[in-house]
């Protein structure tokens, strides 16, 4: 309730964020708690984003598509139902292969996402706890090696789709007149 009743209104009042992002994972926020937080954020003009399906699939990717989240991050254990929901909701799947590498975890089912029509972005997920990697070249290599994306698909994932994951594809992400 602190988030919904005090923090989100303060963020709106101060104009310090464009997005409301929640970590939907066992032991953090449930899918229902995440829904309430994201919908409240939307009421305050904040676009929804969600970190989901990193360790366990508890409904976060399904929620992302259902509410039309701008993006869903991690998605290491994203189930087919989550992929279908993100495809129908227009959610960008922001996959973080360096996190899988450093955790020794599985890799997100990116080929299933691509085949379902989910736009895939890739990023580093730099943080001191699970991914001490700032190297986008490494992320690009993992995209080709572990996600089995073509170089063209990886380039799109780290440019245009990366821009889409922050709702800026109309302004940046490609080299063309007007951008």
Where are these regions (language model features)?
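Metal-coordinating catalytic core of metallo-dependent amide/deamination hydrolases
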Residues: 1-58
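Active-site-adjacent C-terminal substructures of enzyme catalytic domains
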Residues: 47, 57-171
């Amino acid at each position: 309730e602190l988030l919904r009743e005090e923090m989100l209104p303060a963020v709106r009042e101060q104009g310090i964020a464009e997005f409301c992002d929640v970590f939907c994972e066992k032991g953090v926020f449930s899918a229902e708690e995440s829904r309430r937080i994201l919908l409240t954020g939307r009421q305050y003009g904040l676009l929804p984003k969600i970190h989901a399906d990193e360790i366990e699939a508890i409904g976060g990717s399904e929620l992302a598509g259902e509410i039309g989240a701008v993006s869903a991050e991690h998605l290491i254990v994203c189930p087919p139902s989550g992929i279908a929901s993100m495809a129908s909701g227009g959610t960008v799947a922001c996959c973080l292969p360096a996190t899988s590498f450093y955790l020794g975890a599985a890799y997100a089912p990116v080929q299933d996402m691509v085949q379902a029509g989910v736009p895939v972005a890739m990023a580093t997920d730099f943080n001191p706890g699970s991914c001490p990697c700032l190297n986008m070249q490494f992320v690009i290599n993992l995209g080709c090696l572990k996600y089995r994306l073509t170089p063209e698909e990886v380039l799109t994932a780290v440019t245009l789709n990366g821009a889409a994951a922050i709702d800026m594809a109309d302004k940046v992400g490609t080299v063309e007149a007007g951008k």
